[in-house]
Design a protein with these regions (language model features):
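A ligand-binding cleft/hinge motif common to bilobed small-molecule-binding domains
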Residues: 122-126, 249-269
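Short, low-complexity disordered leader/linker segments with a strong preference
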Residues: 1-56, 368-370
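A bilobed periplasmic-binding-protein/Venus flytrap-type ligand-binding module shared by bacterial periplasmic
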Residues: 169-174, 210-212, 282-297, 305, ...
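Extracellular/periplasmic bilobal clamshell ligand-binding domains
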Residues: 328-370
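Extracytoplasmic ligand-binding site segments that recognize negatively charged/polar headgroups
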Residues: 61-76, 88-104, 110-247
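Periplasmic-binding protein-like
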Residues: 164, 192-201, 222-226, 231-233, 237, 304-328, ...
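Short, polar/charged alpha-helical segment
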Residues: 26-30, 44-55, 65-86, 168
Length: 370
């Protein structure tokens, strides 16, 4: 008899528990909707309704910060998933292009774009021209299948679809094994002084150390690095090519994905170093444009890029780029088990301040043209 009662109680719990959980989830969504509405934000509570509205919209126009092959691959994958949508994408990754589009918006020029690439340091300037859709809450409530940390918790509507891992490059034929740096302090050794080291005048890579080391430490380090009398450069691809050709031996603070791309293309003398704490920054930030005619389709596309399929496309095609916040992504795997200096949203918003202070610590250098 006791066994029968226990079974009946267990069955009763199993039937009631899902209802209670659903009620709890529903209450959470209702509360999120109230909070969003109080801030003037829209929050869709049903993914099926988003899809139904996207079917009526039928298309999507986006200015994306990815390379063209990636854009094509994402477009094809998105169309396969949602065959009723006809997307039109254009490459928009150049900072000058982003600034020019912002000036057009500020001048009152009308736009038919639904999604735009936004520079991290330009988020405040773009804020007035973004659609007030609470993507963060929709991700937290499971309406959109997006890792919530990919979305800015302050603006609620800007998403970082990728992360950049800052690394070090060297030519293995030119740099002896015993001089290969193992720590950040190793770059300050006499062996690397006197124009034996490339350093970018734009200090975004060294700024990536601030979250782990603190701004004061990084400013001091920047002054010591400048005292090494490096070759000051601007940009990476041209100098990585020169390094692969045997012109330089060591590049401080370049991009992991940039070095790996070149190795894939045959630059086998190049090697990449991941030094802890590893600077990782949120990049490929995008938002839905204010007044977008196809906001529901825009939400579905951002969700698609944030998905495992979209992240794999970026790693394979971009290549070597994905979000550290995407579980199981290659970037998350690369960072796993290492001490990370994570430039999260709080630090991303302070990036302009870091850049200004570190440029001063460098001594306001200029690129040394040949």
């Amino acid at each position: 008899m006791k066994i029968l009662v226990a079974i009946l109680l267990a069955l009763a719990y199993c039937s009631v528990a899902p209802v209670a959980q659903a009620g709890s989830a529903g209450a959470g969504l209702m509360q999120a909707q109230k909070e969003a509405e109080a801030k003037g934000f829209r929050l869709e509570g049903n993914r099926e309704e988003i899809i139904a509205k996207a079917k009526k919209e039928g298309g999507l126009r986006a200015l994306l910060g990815f390379d063209k092959p990636t854009i094509v691959a994402l477009r094809d994958g998105f169309r396969k998933k949602y065959p009723f949508i006809n997307p039109h994408f254009e490459e928009h990754g150049n900072p000058a292009e982003s600034q020019r589009y912002l000036l057009e918006l500020q001048a009152g020029r009308t736009s038919d774009w639904d999604i735009v690439n936004v520079l991290n340091e330009g988020q405040y300037e773009y804020a007035s021209y973004t659609e007030k859709i609470d993507l963060r809450a929709m991700a937290e409530q499971g309406v959109l299948q997006i890792p919530p940390k990919m979305i800015n918790p302050e603006s609620r509507n800007v998403i970082a679809l990728s992360s950049t891992v800052d690394a070090v490059a060297y030519n293995k034929k030119l740099l002896p094994p015993d001089l290969v740096p193992k720590t950040w302090d190793d770059f300050l050794k006499p062996a690397h002084s006197g124009r034996k080291l490339l350093v970018d005048i734009r200090p975004n890579s060294i700024a990536g150390l601030v979250p782990a080391m603190g701004l004061e430490w990084v400013e001091s380090y920047a002054r010591k690095l400048a005292a090494q009398q490096p070759v000051w450069v601007r940009g990476h691809t041209r100098y990585l090519n020169a390094m692969a050709a045997g012109e330089y031996r060591l590049f401080f603070g370049t991009y992991y994905h940039g070095v790996m791309r070149m190795k894939n293309r045959g630059a086998q003398d190049l090697e990449v170093l991941i030094i802890e704490p590893v600077p990782v920054r949120l990049t490929e930030t995008h938002t839905i444009v204010k007044g977008a005619r196809r906001p529901n389709t825009a939400m579905l596309f951002l969700e698609y890029v944030a998905s495992a399929e979209g992240q794999k496309i970026m790693w394979d095609v971009e290549p070597f780029k994905s979000s550290i916040y995407s579980p199981g992504s290659k970037t998350e795997e690369l960072a796993r088990g290492k001490k990370i200096s994570l430039g999260d949203w709080e630090h991303a918003m302070k990036q302009p301040v870091y850049m200004e202070k570190l440029t001063a610590a460098f001594g306001f250098p200029r690129e040394e043209k040949k």
